[in-house]
Amino acid sequence: MIKTELNYGDVYLVPKKTVVDSRKECDTSVQFGPRRFAMPVYPSNMKSVVSAETCELFAREGWFYTLHRFNVDAVAFTRYMQEQGLFASISVGVNDDTYEQLDALKAAGLSPEYMTLDIANAWCVKAERMIKHIKQHFPNTFLIGGNVATAEAARDLEAWGCDAIKAGIAGGRVCITKNKTGFHRPMVSTVRDCVAAVTIPVIADGGIVEHGDIAKALVCGATMVMAGSLFAGYDESAGDIVEIAGKHYKEYFGSASQFNKGAYVNVEGKKILVEYKGSMGKLLRELQEDLQSSVSYAGGTTLAALREVEMIQVYR
């Protein structure tokens, strides 16, 4: 029998009695690894979304971030961030160049506070080898592994040594994996299954369309939420500005796109133009205000209240 699964657009949250006088009383901070952050959402570690400058901005604002892994000097970035009194959070792959990158970090006496193993399907033998290698050589680094889409995969990544996992395959706006391969799982079902399977934090990665989807992901049990298109198109975002018929746009492309790879090989991503939106400051304020409202509707004062909210399916 074919299973029916759910995405964020298929569900809503049932309001509870509000116990605060003002939404501003609601605390949106989250403990993630060794640090506490202002919000449980952060930009995708994509070359068209974050740059080193974007990451520094988020760190200074008290938000989590992860730098992408494409043509990055991890040694220079880690050293710079730590010299600034900020935390370093980098991404790595599973191929030979990553082992060389890790050797360079170790030779420099550097250990990033956070590291994300970032590949399309982390439920594989190469990821297992890399996770065990990282935990052996960087035991004090908080290691995030991704991406996965099933309970069994999540359990394996925890067993291999990950401190958190990233859940979601082919849910992003510029990801065409589901079109090219037929493989994908809706995010509500993915996150709930992965959360139930492990004892470590789960990051819901992909499928965020509206601000309210962040609250839905947290209700599903996610500790953190990663979003790409939500953070694209701003001054502080990566990507080039393009002018068409007097309007300004920024390029936004997937990590598996031809534009990121530099060649049309195993392409599972595309490039789109998103409207240029100016400064990101307004977005960060709105995201926090909207999540404070979500917490108030959940009948609490902290993000923990969202774990007790009823989720209902809507038929369209």
UniProtKB/Swiss-Prot annotation:
NADP(+) binds at residues 202-225. Keywords: NADP, Oxidoreductase. Gene3D superfamilies: Aldolase class I. This is GMP reductase. It is an enzyme of class 1 (oxidoreductase). GO terms for cellular component: cytosol; GMP reductase complex. GO terms for biological process: purine nucleotide metabolic process. SUPFAM superfamilies: Inosine monophosphate dehydrogenase (IMPDH). Catalyzes the irreversible NADPH-dependent deamination of GMP to IMP. It functions in the conversion of nucleobase, nucleoside and nucleotide derivatives of G to A nucleotides, and in maintaining the intracellular balance of A and G nucleotides. It comes from the Bacteria. The active site is at C175 (thioimidate intermediate). GO terms for molecular function: GMP reductase activity. InterPro entries: Aldolase_TIM (IPR013785), GMP_reductase (IPR050139), GuaC_type_2 (IPR005994), IMP_DH_GMPRt (IPR001093).
